[in-house]
Every structure is written in C-alpha cells, then in structure tokens.
Amino acid sequence: NSKVKIMSLEKTACFGTCPVYHIEIYNNGFATYNGKKFVTIKGLHNLEISKNDISKILKKAKEIDFQNLKNEYTENITDLPTTYIMVKNKKIKDYFGAPKKLKELEKMIEDVILNKLEITSF
C-alpha cells in the first residue's frame, strides 16, 4: 500500500510576521507539518490524519470544483504571503483575490493540522 501525496498547503513569507509553514497529506492518512518561521510549533512533525477528515476535505474540493478553478489568483501588490494549495494533481497559487470557497478549503486543511498539533493558530 504505497503512500501518495493527495494534498498540500504552503504559506510563504511576507514583510511582517506571517506564519511560514508547509503541510502535506497522503492517501494513507500520513501527514507532515513543517513550521518554518513565525509559528507556534517549529520543525518537521509527522501526524496521522483520519480517513474521515481526508474524505471531508476531498469532498469540499469537489464541491467547489477545485480542478476547474484558476491556477493563479494574483494582483500587483507587495507584502502579502502566498498560499500554494494542491489537491490531487492540481496546484493553485493564491496571492490575492481568490474566491471565498478556495479560502474555506485552505482553512479546512489548516484546521485539521492545527487540531492534530493541539494548537489554535500557527
């Protein structure tokens, strides 16, 4: 039973104290969280995500038609962090102006990881 990465979420730096971290979730429930800068928990942590949580996230991705969203939401503005979200084989760059439904999906992934790390914010 090989593990395949089915989703990831990465937050990049801004000019302030934006949290910088990387999350990967695999089909077998294995997940990694790597807290880089301005986060409560730093370093690489291995986590176990329930199949139910994975199913909920994948269901939400399907509901918002993730595969057909634009590949990039960006604007000519500086200082903002960038979020890269990947579900299955599609990756989206969310810098500015992404639809609310995409933000909700990002938050779902974050909430599952926050819950596993037993913290309220990154």
Task: List each language-model region with its residue ranges.
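A short, structured beta-strand/loop element
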Residues: 22-33, 79-82
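A short-motif feature that recognizes glycine-rich, charge-decorated loops
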Residues: 32-67
